Structures are given as C-alpha cells and as structure tokens.
Curated annotation (Swiss-Prot):
Parts of the chain that traverse the membrane: none
Protein name (Swiss-Prot/TrEMBL): ATP-dependent protease subunit HslV
UniProt enzyme class: hydrolase
Species the sequence originates in: Borrelia duttonii (strain Ly)
Family: Belongs to the peptidase T1B family. HslV subfamily.
Alphabetic keyword roster: Allosteric enzyme, Cytoplasm, Hydrolase, Metal-binding, Protease, Sodium, Threonine protease
C-alpha cells in the first residue's frame, strides 16, 4: 500500500517539538482510509518521526533510523549523525535504495528531513513539511509562527487544516505527537 499524498509537519517552539500528520490514505484515485497514523515516537519517546511514502518502506526506515540512533556505544542520542548514516545506507544499499519514502525526524533540539536521494536537510526556520500538501502546510505554518501566542501544536494543527482545505490528498483527521 502506498501513502500517496500525505502531509506531515514538524515544528519546534518554546521548548516543545511537534510532529503531526493527516490521516488520509489513497490508492490511485480512491480514499482507502481516513484515520491512518503516519507518525511515531522512537527511542522511548525522545524522538518523533513522520513519513510520506510507502507504508512498509516507512516502517523499515523507522526501524533502521532507530537502530542508527541506538548504535552509539556512549548512549548519546544524536539524530543528526543517525540521519546522515541512514541517508548513506538508503542511497547506497541495494535493497534500501528501492525504498520510496521521505521522513521527518525531530527531537527537542533538531528537526531533520531525510530522503532516499541522500539528502538530510535541517530547516532554517523551526518548521518543515513534506508530502503532497507539504508546501501548503509549510506556508501556513510560517505565517502562524509570527503569532507568538500560538504553541507549536496549535500551529501544526492549523497549518494541516489549511493544507486539507487545498490538497485533495490531505484530510483533516490530524494525529499529533509532542515532546519537550
């Protein structure tokens, strides 16, 4: 099954980090599910991750990413190092190279986008979004970030609601996780 047209957003603000996603699953031109969960807490709830792409591929990548984080002998959680290591493997490994997904990973200090082309991007702003409605959610979130009264969770929720109004592959059944 393929999560075609997913919208996932990550935001950091005031010591809180949020990853949120819509719940729509489409297959071709058909909506198969409206309440899918596309985000996870990893490493005992210290890291949030969300994905756009094939479901089985995303689960594999979540597992590989968590392995990379936990592989440090000193026990330090370094999502930047783990993201780079995963991106290297994803790009060069014959099996992983075929996986079709994008990931957002975040902890209390970082937000990163990881792609199968080997990209690891840390956004300039404390917000990033992926998927078919990603640009809509990102634009809305940037505008909402100017309102200092809104929390990271408020901004993510409002931004995804706007994306759902514009993108036919995004719905307003939002799942949100927060750390910090």
């Amino acid at each position: 099954m393929n999560f075609k047209g997913t919208t996932v957003i990550a935001i950091r603000r005031a010591g809180k980090t949020v990853v949120a996603a819509d719940g729509q699953v489409t297959f071709g031109y058909t909506v198969l599910k409206s309440n899918a969960v596309k985000i996870r807490k990893l490493v005992n709830g210290k890291i949030l991750a969300g994905f756009a792409g094939s479901t089985s591929d995303a689960i594999t990548l979540f597992e590989k990413f968590e392995e990379k984080v936990k592989s440090r002998e000193d026990g330090i959680i370094d999502i930047k190092r783990a993201a780079v290591d995963l991106a290297k493997d994803w790009r060069s490994d014959k099996i992983l190279h075929k996986l079709e997904a994008m990931m957002l990973v975040a902890d209390s200090d970082n937000i990163l986008l990881i792609s199968g082309t080997g990209d690891v991007v840390e956004p300039e702003e404390d917000v990033i979004s992926i998927g078919s409605g990603g640009n809509y959610a990102y634009s809305a979130a940037l505008a909402y970030m100017e309102n200092k009264k809104l929390s990271a969770a408020d901004i993510a929720f409002k931004a995804l609601k706007i994306a759902a109004r514009v993108c036919i592959y995004t719905n307003s059944n939002i799942v949100l996780e927060e750390i910090g």
